[in-house]
Design a protein with these regions (language model features):
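PLP-dependent amino-acid enzyme catalytic core
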Residues: 1-337
């Protein structure tokens, strides 16, 4: 979506609460009385040194429901409340579903959440705890989306990648990164990449900051996919997706397609970024290595550490400002017994 706004003054921002709503002018909700919030946003940006590189971890997994999804959900459900909608349907691999269930509970909106049957039990339990109706689909992530779309013919479809309000909320991560770095853009931003919501939102946010003269360059945006399910990598590398993909422990990014595929690839290309793939073994090692640094994240988030190692082989990262998003809590993941 496109709307005009003037980014808030830096001195004014210092007076505002540390949530996504500090950037109120940039969020397309007409009235404050419709805002649905758990004070999400302004997640910690933690300086670390990894393999001789100074970098920052953006701890999105400390959000109210344990994932980056809360940013987009706050704006999406605020808009739903503003429109007077009382029932919604949503599909998810788990994190977005849990987030939507929580914010719908706060807004007193009835939610029906579709997830793959093989989704983590912890995520499914979280959705049910908030009072949403959980519908399990025996199929992959794309089949789950189709089932939700069929069910949403007579109600509101609150899907994260389709809905522009979700993107508008998630773009605030870009704003925070720049503000937390002293109003300077990083050189690289890395995040897990599934359906592409985070990548698209980062692109939107950084582009708005550049267009308003707040930063003078776009960071290189790097998406990390699981080798077993990597349609964006294949398209970025060769121009073609495979006909079929396998399963991955990183369930949150197990998407074989995206409804905004070309738009998301364009974000990577515009930023002169790239897409990286990592193996299942590398993901397991990433979980352990991150936990030994004090970061307890789910497998979907852990792809970024081996992704960083691979990026180092192809780019000179010395003296570069690197920000890496840790997007989902390890508490959401059920380890196989």
């Amino acid at each position: 979506m496109s709307f005009s706004y003037e980014f808030p003054d830096r001195q004014e921002l210092q007076k505002r609460p540390s949530t996504i709503w500090r950037y109120r002018e940039a969020l397309p909700i007409e009235s404050d009385r419709h805002i649905v919030s758990f004070q999400e946003g302004y997640s910690p940006l933690v300086l670390d040194r990894v393999d001789g590189l100074d970098l920052w971890w953006k701890l999105e997994y400390v959000a109210p429901t344990g994932s980056v999804k809360d940013r987009g959900t706050s704006v999406l459900i605020s808009r739903i409340k503003e429109m007077g909608i009382e029932r919604i349907v949503e599909d998810s691999s788990g994190n977005a579903g849990a987030s939507v269930a929580a914010y719908c509970a706060r807004a007193q909106v009835s939610a029906r959440i579709f997830v793959p049957q093989r989704a983590s039990p912890n995520k499914k339990q979280q959705i049910k705890i908030y009072g949403a109706e959980l519908v399990e689909v025996s199929g992959d992530r794309e089949e789950t989306a189709k089932a939700a779309q069929c069910a949403a013919k007579n109600t509101y479809y609150a899907n994260q990648i389709w809905n522009p309000y979700f993107i508008e909320g998630t773009k605030t991560c870009s704003f925070e990164i720049v503000e937390q770095l002293g109003w300077e853009a990083p050189d690289y931003v890395m995040a897990p990449m599934g359906v592409g919501t985070i990548i698209l939102s980062l692109g939107v946010g950084f582009r708005e900051l550049r267009d308003q003269g707040i930063i003078n360059h776009l960071p290189h945006i790097v998406g990390v996919q699981a080798q077993n399910c990597c349609p964006f990598y294949d398209a970025w590398k060769s121009g073609h997706k495979r006909k079929a993909y396998g399963s991955t422990i990183a369930e949150g990014i197990a998407h074989t397609d995206s409804p905004r595929f070309e738009e998301i690839l364009a974000v990577i290309r515009e930023s002169q970024g790239c897409v990286i793939i990592v193996s299942e073994e590398e993901i397991h090692k990433g979980i352990t290595a991150l936990s030994h640094r004090g970061f307890f994240v789910e497998p979907t988030s852990a792809v970024v550490l081996p992704g960083l190692s691979k990026l180092c082989r192809h780019a000179d990262l010395a003296e570069r400002k690197i920000v890496i998003l840790l997007t989902g809590s390890g508490l959401k993941y059920t380890r196989p017994s």
